[in-house]
Each structure stands twice: as C-alpha cells, then as structure tokens.
Amino acid sequence: MTHPSDTGSAPVLALRDVSKSFGAVRALRDVSLELFPGEVHALAGENGAGKSTLIKTLAGVHRPDAGHVLLDGAPVVFHGPGDARDAGIAVIYQEPTLFPDLSIAENIFMGRQPRRALGRIDHKATHDATAALMLRLGVELDPDRPARGLSIADQQIVEIAKALSFDARVLIMDEPTAALTGSEVARLFGVVRTLRDQGAAVLFISHRLEEIFHICARVTTLRDGAWIASEPLEGMTEDDLVRRMVGRDLDELYPKQEVTPGERALSVRRLTREGVFTDVSFEVRRGEIVALAGLVGAGRTEVARAVFGVDRWDAGEVEVDGKPLVNGAPSTAMAAGLALVPEDRRAQGLVMDMSIERNIGLTGLRTTVKAGLVDRGAERSRSLDWAVKLQVKYARIADTVATLSGGNQQKVVLAKWLATGPKVLIVDEPTRGIDVGTKAEVHRLLSQLAADGVAVLMISSDLPEVLGMADRVLVMHEGRLTAEISRTDATEETVMAAATGRAAA
C-alpha cells in the first residue's frame, strides 16, 4: 500500500520535537508526529505515556514549551481550542457531551443555525444540512430526533457530524470504542473508513491492539513521554507493538495458573429480578476464575450488583460458604467475605477528589477508628502496604486519586477491596480502559488470588481475556444464562453463539 508521503503528499498536521512539562513532570519530550490526509494513524502507549498531553497539544488546550505545531507545513500557535477548531482540528472523546433535550440537528449547529431574512432560525435548512452530513457519513439518523436516548455509538456519530460541520480535516478519536458493542464498533469503523476515503486525517487512540491493527495504517508509539517510533503497521505483530510500548518483552498477557478448585464459595440459585434477569443459577469454587460473558445489556452487571446486595432481587437466593445472604444488604455481603470491583471505577469505585490513601482505606474504617476518630497513622500504613503490593504509581499517597492514570486508579479500587480479605471477588470489566502493561499485572493478580484460594467471578466483554483467564465461562443472553463452557471447550465461536442466543444452556 502506498503511503501518502510516498506520493509527495504533505502532512496536514504535525508536531516537531515538542516538549511539555507540568512542574517537575515532563509529560512530552521531543515528540514528533505526522498526520496525512486519507490515513488513519494510531497513537499507542501505556497510561502515563503522554497520549493525553499530545492530544491536548494538537487540540489547542496546551501550548508546547519547546518545538512546533505545524499546519500544512507551516508553524502555527493555537491560543485555545477555538483556534484549533477553526484550523479544522476536532477531538471526538469516548464520552460525548450532547445536550439531551435538543435534537441531533440542534446539537450539531448549536449557535450556528441558518437564519431567515428576519433573523429567525431556518429549521428546514438546519434539518437539511444535518441530513446531508449523515448521508456523507453513510448513516441513518433522524436530524429531528432528541439526543436523549441515543446510544453512545450514535452520540459519537453526532459528534463526528458536528466536527464535519466545522469543515474538520483532522479528527482525533480518543478511545472511541471503549463503551461500544462489537456491532457498534463495526459501524463506527465504517464511518472512519468513509472519512479516510474522503481525505480526512484520523488520529486513533485505543488500548485495544486488535482495533489498531484493524483500522490503522501507521502507528506512533510513546513511552514515558518520549517518542519511540512512527512506522507502518504492515508486517508488525501485536507483540512487536507491546515491546515498543513497555520497553521490554511483556510476560504472558494471560498468566493463568492451573489450580484444582476447592470447596464451593459462592452459590447463586434461581436469582430473578423482574424485567432484568431471570432464573440465574451458578456457583464459583475456591481457586476458580469463572468468567461471566455476554453482550452489553445481557444482564451481567445487574446480576453482580444483586449478588453483592446493591440491588434487591425478587426471587432466588445467594450463599457464601453455604450461608445465605440478606437480600439488598451490601454490608452483610462484605461481612460474609464478598467484594465487588464495579464496572465504572470513577463513578462507583472511587471518590475522585479524595486522596489515594483515603480511597484505599474506605473499606477498613471499622478497623482504623478509635474512640470515634479515624486513626490516620493506621489508615496510612494500611493504604501504603496495599499500594506497594499492587505497585500503584503515584507521587504522594496523599494526592487525590484523580491525579492517577486509569490503570493506577483501577489498582486503587482493587487495593481497597483486597484489603478486606475477600473469600469471593467479583470484578466487573477489570481491565477496561487500561494499558496493556497494567492489564498483564491485573491478570497476574487475579491468577495469584485464585491460586491463594479466592473465588473470582470476572465479568468481561474482552473475549481474549475471557478465554485466557477463565476456568469456566458462563454466558448470558437477554437476562438468562444460556451456556456454561469449560476452559477446554471455550472458543470465540462457542461463546459468541451463546451470547447471541444461538446455543442452548
């Protein structure tokens, strides 16, 4: 395949030897990047590698301390995001920010609606302009439909259409697939290819390496704020890219230790919550990692929340070590030895404006409170111990957890719950949105916990993770368990057949 530079095409947007520091922290060090028209270019690196700073530099949020941003080959200074937008640069974030009560057309042309002669908004022209954008993207979305109720995938398409309405030539897509189903990812990739074929330059950021290899032609890799390489993906393997990202050969990504399951630790029998899930039964034994697989909306997270007592169930029973749990009582579940690492770590697993040590210490307040006051020394000692065990990277343990990368935030959530000494650990999407190096660390941790006798129930939408880490795979479809598959029989085909309702339990 001919690269644009081989035909004399110049990069539409580039960085040359850009550096950026925040206090004593050097976020970018002599980083260079070239984005060409008609190409999808990946930006790869672990959390903390400098990807976010690079994106914000291209988008006009940050100004480089050294080096240059080049637009059509000429140095340019963006004084803010508005300058970058006017230059044709748009960022599509993983969580769109639309006004829910406005229509798709109103969201796209907010403050810029076509006007009639007397200054009144020309709704037909706004509708027609939006319809033309959707036609250009090859999607069918009603311009008059309210944004409320749109899927994340459709919201992202609206954001892309909005970017095109500003005549964007460069689209920066930051983890756009993190919350999408497989079919939604395929649809989004169709839109990306359309943009590419129409001459747009696309910078694509994803922790899912298979997506990078599927949609991108070239990749720039960052490590610890430094530029490592910019190169074609053709001829590379995922292992090659991982080595560039982490600077070493990564140990096995799925280091599952073989164990002999012990006694039954968790038993769920005929659990039902009307309209959500029905007649769900399974068990997890000590030393096992049992995966709960299925499509988004199948009811997996809802089952986990009910088991832990966050939500009440209407029928059925849950037992830990043969003793029944009280319906809808998380404190009782904790006391029985259950721990739940939730899917949304920022909203449900952490208090973002609280320190790292306080977040880790939240589950141990009963053991660190003396005479009605928290023993800060005991709390800090306990938190430091777990932060070291899980290799959390931070400047000071008193810093807010919001200052950490996504992978280190996930380690804090894990530390908080492991500090309770759980018999049963439920982890919901444990590696979503974290880099490949941290993902391997989380997998090693789960494997070691199972080897130590903890019963692990792992909810995951990452099929390679399910196949690589689970002793057994339970599959849900539309609120029901449709299959239980052994490790030896589990394949992408058997799991997906059950997840889509094509296999019977």
From Swiss-Prot:
ABC transporter domain ranges (all copies): 13-249, 254-503
Principal subcellular localisation of the protein: membrane
Transmembrane segments: none
PROSITE patterns, sorted: ABC_TRANSPORTER_1, ABC_TRANSPORTER_2, RBSA
Keyword Transcription among UniProt keywords: no
EC number per UniProt: 7.5.2.7
Binding positions for ATP per the UniProt entry: G45, E46, N47, G48, A49, G50, K51, S52
GO MF, any single term: ATP binding
Membrane topology type: Peripheral membrane protein
Pfam families xrefs: ABC_tran
PANTHER family in the record: CARBOHYDRATE TRANSPORT ATP-BINDING PROTEIN MG119-RELATED, D-ALLOSE IMPORT ATP-BINDING PROTEIN ALSA-RELATED
Assembly description: The complex is composed of an ATP-binding protein (RbsA), two transmembrane proteins (RbsC) and a solute-binding protein (RbsB).
Protein name in the entry: Ribose import ATP-binding protein RbsA 1
Organism field: Streptomyces coelicolor (strain ATCC BAA-471 / A3(2) / M145)
Organism phylogeny: Bacteria, Bacillati, Actinomycetota, Actinomycetes, Kitasatosporales
